[in-house]
Every structure is written in structure tokens, then in C-alpha cells.
Amino acid sequence: MGIVMLTFNEYTTISNNCSDNKQLSDAINSVCSAALEESSVISHEIKNQAAYLKTCYQLLSSRNDELRSNKFWNNMGSTIDELVNYLERTSIYRYSFKQSETVSCTLSDIINNINEYIKSRYNGLIALDTSDISLECSSASIYASSHFLNIALKEIIDNAYEAASERNCNKCILILSAIMSPDIKDQLILSIGSKKTNNGSSIYQPDNISSCINNDINDNNCNRPGLKSKLCKPFYTTHKGHTGLGLSIVNQICLLSGIGWNIVSDNDVVTTVFTFNLQS
């Protein structure tokens, strides 16, 4: 079964047609339900087999000293780890297609969740800088699916860390900036990016976030040609070594949650910009 990724225009067209045609809506829902159920069963079976393979590998390694010093055996272990990780991320991608309840949460809640994730996964390898976030933005109520939003933000953090690691940084510094939209009422703009430590900060700061949203994402002046179209393709990521579906997970979650997002690039530093509707 192939993976199909809809663009925003395709998604909007289908949604509009479904709202006017109940038979079409029922038919699409029936096909989607059957496809999701089938893919879920197959995916779980493959994951179970991969987990069993990894367990067997670890058991053999623990009982044989010669195997642990064998280069080819160790390479096989790395491949098994990548396979298991890939299957886990594929499950997240499939899960991101589900509808989720939209609730009220604050930017402060989001920051706390990000900090917890960084502490548990990276153990001091990432420093989070939130000094540019004002009290007004921190306490603002965002109307979104906090559960799916956390998944999307984890993907962005992982991408930012790997991109920083590629530049041989000893420590990744993530910059979080937030402003109220100067153009649209009741909208919050949040940017996440990694600081380029060797040449100072190349991150988008609050005073130029709003301008970069409308300009830098265009293919003509973005350092990564065709970036916009690639966001709708499965397996695309800003980092070549990233395992799994990366930014496609973020794109799908934002699409279903009504969250706007763009990627901007400056001096090989990639910044992700989210736009949230505030709860009135």
C-alpha cells in the first residue's frame, strides 16, 4: 500500500466537495477507514517482527564476546536499530492522520512540554533559550490540539538537533521566539531554530519573524529550492540523516489542526515558524 500525501489545495478541494455531497463524504470515509485498519494491522505485525529480531540480536550479543567485537555484527545491530526506529516513526505518521480534540492551552504549557522532552531525550545536549518570549505571549491561550502539537514540536526539535550536530556543535542551542501577529488579530507567531554558535546567531528574531513568513519561504529567495513543494512529500526532512518521515508528520498535524507553518532558511540555519489562532 502506497503512502499518499495531499497538498493543502487538494485537501481543501476534497473537504469542500465532501461538505456539499454526503455520498462522496461517506464513500471517502469508508475507504479511509478500511485502508487505515489494514495498514494498522500490517504495521503492527512488522513492528512485532522487528522487535523480536532486535531482542534476539541483543541476546546473542550478550552471550558472545566475539560477536560484540565483530564489525559486521555491530553494523547489523545498527541497521536493526534504524529499522525499529523507522517503523516507530511510520506509526506516528499514520497516527497523525487521526482527528484530535482541539482544546485551549498556553504557550507556557508548550514550553514546559518541550523542556521535559529535551531533558528526557538529550540529557544536556540541548539548551533552550526562551528569553525573547514576553509574558503576554507566554500566557496567551492557543486553540489547538496540544497532544498532536507536542508530537509536531518533537519532530522539529529532533531536526534542529541533527542539523546542529552536522555543523559539529558541541551543544545545540534552540531559540524560541514569539510575537503577536502585527497583521492578523488574535494570532500568535512562534519560531523555533538552532543557533549557529560559530558565527553568532543566525536565527530569526521577533522583529523580523513577520516579514520572513511572507518572503523567505518563497522558492525564489530561499536557500533550499523547491522546499515548499517538498513539504508535501513523505520522507522529506531538512537533514539527510533523519530517520523516518520527519517534516511530513509536522505538515499533516498542522493541516488537520488548523495551524499555519513555514520553514525559512538563512546561512544554512533552518527556522520553523508556526502561527496559532488565539482563543477569543
At which residue positions do the language-model features occur?
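Histidine phosphotransfer helical core of two-component systems
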Residues: Y11-A27, V31-E38, I42, I46-N85
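Conserved DHp (HisKA) dimerization/phosphotransfer helix of two-component histidine kinases, i.e.
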Residues: Q49-C56, S69-L125
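Conserved signal-transmission helix
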Residues: M1-A34, S202, S211-G226
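Short alpha-helical Gxxx[C/S/T] motif in the catalytic ATP-binding
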Residues: G246, V250
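Glycine-rich ATP-binding loops of the HATPase_c
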Residues: G258-D266
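Conserved micro-motifs of the catalytic ATP-binding
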Residues: Y95-S100, C137, S141-A144, T238, ...
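Detector for a conserved hydrophobic position within an alpha-helical segment of the HATPase_c
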Residues: C254-L255
